[in-house]
Amino acid sequence: MPLGQAAHPEQALWCRRLSDDLSGVSLGPLDLGDPGPGEVRLRVRAAALNFPDLLMTRGLYQFKPELPFVMGLEGCGIVQAIGKDVHDFNPGDRVAFSCRHGAFASAVVLPSDAISQVPPSLDDAQAAAYAVTALTAWVSLVRRGRLLAGETLLVHGSSGGVGIAAVQLAKHIGATVIATASSQAKLEL
């Protein structure tokens, strides 16, 4: 049954207890209020699965949300409603978003600074998968690493989401990239 069409108005993928086999994860109802000041309510159209999502369900990630929590770090959706003092977005806008948890739901309420407009060239699945990986690569290479054109960057695990984003960003900056992966097939990505 598609999300949002169940007996409850909103549905979410909840982690109700930590486990090594996802046995503590189940679909269930989600009660969402209206967006408050500076917040937006989104109808989620796609969400991306990241390795930290799985680590959180085992209690092994650096951020440990209180149980129960809705899984998911990033997604793409349509703005349904805006709170007071939100001026950059309007209902109907298609946006990508990132959050500490909560993306695996039919709808989500977030601060407006957690969303960004999506270029028309990206479909929903592509837009859902870029927020966390691209931001992680950017913070690592540009803000923290201060990577410059002409420098050389070694990217271990270049076939994963962050690795792919790091390779693309480093090339865009003008750096020379040396990439590693666990197999030749992955290097050909």
Can you say where each PLM-predicted feature lies in the sequence?
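Short alpha-helical
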Residues: 20, 49, 62, 102-103, ...
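Conserved hydrophobic/aromatic beta-strand scaffold that supports enzyme active sites
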Residues: 27-32, 76-78, 107-109, 115
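Short, conserved catalytic or interaction motifs in soluble domains
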Residues: 84, 120, 182
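Glycine-rich beta-strand-centered segment in the early N-terminal region that forms part
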Residues: 31-48, 60-102
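Mid-domain Rossmann-like dinucleotide-binding core that forms the NAD(H)/NADP(H) cofactor-binding site
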Residues: 131-189
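Short structural boundary motif marking the start of a folded domain
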Residues: 6-13, 40
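Cytochrome P450 core scaffold surrounding the K-helix E-X-X-R motif
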Residues: 51-58
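NAD(P)H dinucleotide-binding glycine-rich loop of Rossmann-like/cofactor-binding domains
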Residues: 24, 43, 55, 94-157
